[in-house]
Regions:
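Von Willebrand factor
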Residues: 1-95, 100-105, 124, 128
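A generic alpha-helix structural signal
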Residues: 2-5, 51, 111
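Sec/Tat-exported extracytoplasmic proteins
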Residues: 5, 9-16, 55-58, 73-81, ...
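Extracellular/luminal ectodomains of metazoan preproproteins built from arrays
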Residues: 10, 15, 63-64, 140
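Loop/turn elements at helix/coil->beta-strand transitions in domains of secreted/extracellular proteins
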Residues: 16-20, 87-91, 115-122
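VWA/integrin I-like adhesion module and closely mimicked acidic/polar interface patches used
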Residues: 98-140
């Protein structure tokens, strides 16, 4: 999954005054690994170093709580206090195994309206990717 994130990052012109990228990891909890306000990390080298560190240390395959990730994004990522730029469009791409936990809340309850204009969910399962886009607030 991290290699898919790395490939996606490679497609953008990343920088403090260009495309900014935030990384949130999640399982039974969600954690912001890079925020928009961390300008020193808004370059491909720094983001790739983060991915290398995650690959070496993080475990995949735990509980999937996509709702917690969306809630964290709404509360901690797409905020001006954390570096969100009001005049730039907000796009969120969620990498998931496609099966959020049965106790997950509906996405429309955890992601405030109009925080993001486009959500794309990339479901990776058995090394096959399937891209599904849906309007903000709708569950896949």
């Amino acid at each position: 999954m991290l290699e898919s994130v790395r490939t996606l990052i490679s497609k953008y012109n990343v920088g403090p005054t260009k495309t900014r990228i935030s990384v949130v990891t999640y399982d039974k909890k969600a954690q912001v690994r890079v925020s928009f306000k961390e300008l020193e990390k808004q370059n491909k080298d720094a983001l790739n170093s983060l991915l290398d560190s995650m690959k070496a240390r993080d475990k995949l395959g735990g509980v999937t709580r996509t709702d917690l990730a969306l809630e964290t994004v709404g509360n901690e990522v797409f905020t001006t206090a954390n570096g969100d730029r009001p005049n730039s469009p907000n796009v969120m791409i969620v990498f998931t195994d496609g099966a959020t936990h049965k106790k997950s809340k509906p996405y429309s309850e955890v992601l405030p309206p109009l925080v993001v204009s486009i959500i794309c969910t990339i479901i990776l399962h058995f090394h096959r990717g399937r891209l599904v886009c849906f309007p903000a607030g709708d569950s896949p």
